[in-house]
Amino acid sequence: MLLLWALLALGCLRCGWTVNLQPQLASVTFATNNPTLTTVALEKPLCMFDSSEPLSGSYEVYLYAMVDSAMSRNVSVQDSAGVPLSTTFRQTQGGRSGPYKAAAFDLTPCGDLPSLDAVGDVTQASEILNAYLVRVGNNGTCFWDPNFQGLCNPPLTAATEYRFKYVLVNMSTGLVQDQTLWSDPIWTNRPIPYSAIDTWPGRRSGGMIVITSILGSLPFFLLVGFAGAIILSFVDMGSSDGEMTHDSQITQEAVPKTLGTSEPSYSSVNRGPPLDRAEVFSSKLQD
């Protein structure tokens, strides 16, 4: 049903006059959380500028953004010669002093749009979203990168009212061919104060409480286990030293030494009789 509604909305865009059209927020079918604190997703002007007849030549669509003010509905995005403005986010203080060019993309012909029936296909979802949507404020690094050369689309300011406008530019002449009206004011989300965040455990489920308790006590058990491992290692080292000392004492006692003589004692060598006894024994044999 939502896909049929989206197709019907695109068909209605073809029936309307270009001067009466405004940029619109993306449908919840494509962007569920929109706007965010720093981004706004808009529907691209599909079948808007070429609704009456196909365009011949090379065209691009420029998207301009500015902070809402009393005069923002009448602000022009081109000079007196019809050349579109090239002002940047930095030059306009984030759109507060005037409109800046937030995005630029090729104009896709109506007949070349991807089918919305495949929006549920994960492999084609990114392509379809890029074809139908443009997101303002999705580049968080270009503003702080001094070497960035492309079109910078920095994050928007939270809780701020913005307006947007599409401009069709003929790339052959570099002049504005057509443009939409400024959009209605669109607010970015407001950050939730810390005091408003509900931290009462009574509103949490039983599973959340159990998981939180386990995670909270896990460091204590790890610390106890680590301390026990250190103590056991010291105990094992002490018992090993005692055994080595006992063995060395037994070895020393097993090798006695004769007092009053300098002859070394070898416990493992079978020594013969003394020299005087050997001489007596040999004399008896001769007799």
Swiss-Prot record:
Residues 236-287 are cytoplasmic. GO terms for cellular component: apical plasma membrane; apical plasma membrane urothelial plaque; endoplasmic reticulum membrane. The keyword Metal-binding does not apply. It is a single-pass type I membrane protein. Residues 243-287 are annotated as: Disordered. Glycans are attached at residues 74, 139, 170. Residues 19-207 are lumenal. CDD domains: UP_IIIa (cd09970). Its main location: endoplasmic reticulum. It comes from the Eukaryota. It is found in: Endoplasmic reticulum membrane. Belongs to the uroplakin-3 family. PANTHER family: UROPLAKIN III (PTHR15446), UROPLAKIN-3A (PTHR15446:SF17). Component of the asymmetric unit membrane (AUM); a highly specialized biomembrane elaborated by terminally differentiated urothelial cells. May play an important role in AUM-cytoskeleton interaction in terminally differentiated urothelial cells. It also contributes to the formation of urothelial glycocalyx which may play an important role in preventing bacterial adherence. This is Uroplakin-3a. The lineage of its organism: Eukaryota, Metazoa, Chordata, Craniata, Vertebrata. The gene is Upk3a.
